[in-house]
Amino acid sequence: MNEPFQVRPADLVGCRFRLRQRWAHPEIGPTPSGESRQAQLEAARELVFAALPTKRAVGDGRRKAFVRVDLPPATTPTELLSRDAETRAAMRRGAHLITRAVLCGTLEGIRVVDEIDVLVRTDDGYLPVIVSNHRVARKDPESSTRMVPTGRLGLGKPLAVRAKPRHHTIDGYRLAMAELLLGDSATGLGASIGQDRERAYLGEVTRFVPPMLRALGAPIPDEPLRLKQCAGCRFWQLCEPRLRELDDISLVFSGGRGDAWRDRGIVTVQGLIDASCGEASVIARSWREGIPVLRRQGPIRVPRADVEIDVDMEAYLDQGAYLWGAYDGAVYRAFVTWDDVGGEAEERNFTQFWRWLMGVRDAAHAAGKTFAAYCYAAGGENHWMKSSAKRFDSVELAEVQAFIASDEWVDVFAHVRTHLVGTDGLGLKVLGPVVGFTWEDDDVDGEVSVALRRAAREGGVDGAAARETLLRYNEDDCRATRAVREFLDAGAPGLPLL
């Protein structure tokens, strides 16, 4: 590479070998899912930039100058260095707001770059503000934090609000790096704008400086290690062949799951097979032989009922659940809203789903029949059922909690983990082919569904197609859940014993 290489805060989180690959292979661009994530983040930035003030309002002293500098995007290292110079020039001019700011420098002898979405002039210096697509704070009557409305950044003072900040390592590293690169203009504070684009939550950032510097100074691995996120990484096409060449144990036990074996000197799949370490060695051998799922010894028991409903939910980020799908073995029903979540539309939709589900249960009981509703990995459904009851008045929280705790709400994944072992996990998409089920849209996952939800709300031909895809995907998840539990109920035929 002819251009100077710079370390970013994102390089310090997750896979550290990615940094080496990014330096050696700049020609490899992001994956489609990576491009989708970037597009979603850019859309979030644009919403924030549109909300930022461009002049003083009545009561701000409108005769006083208000300077906002909007810098163009930068991608290459050379462009980033140029934006750094423009950012610092705008700071010397005393600009009140600088969007798409870039700060470059050297920390611990390492060249770094930090892209800050907004720099805000304060009485003490400049406040870095970052934009993300995760939730950075949650309402909490027992907690207090400070916030500046997005439309008042550069003009208003912080307000105390009842909310509890949510820490994300990458956010802390971005703000900590900015704190050091700002030098004398740093204030010790930073702000984050998350899914609520109207609020910039303030926090003290100096506490993130030591861990950020430790991460920056940590040695970069010489070889790859398989992690959970590898499947969606642009460099997996390079790392997977090398891992197979090394026969690295992380191919079977990814991330920290292989540390115990490494500590014992077992670093390869074959080494684990030869060590005859019980279940782990059997799993390694099965992986080598291309066997995705094994069955544990003993009888398989899965709760069954006279009336059975398979449920799957789709949520938009951390903002709300817009789709509750239900399959009764013959008919799929979609309780869906394409309007904004978090308000009346989501409440009405959840209430309709809940009353329908409870109505089916009550009718079964009245007919002297047993009832059960099933889902695969109930964490998401449980969260949004309880959250919906807490946020809205239509359904009692106690009623939801009682249902979740009852034998009539069954997490199929819990039974899968009891009876099966996967050589590459036990996700629904892993088990589908094993039990003979295929998705019509097998390229859709949780991340893609976020992009589809955005498209679905835009209307037109593309919006209609996105809606159809989301409903089809949700229906297939419901049907796959039923297929998995019926496979278990049949004794998991054809699976080799562990």
Where are these regions (language model features)?
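Generic beta-strand/beta-sheet core signal
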Residues: 275, 311, 374-377
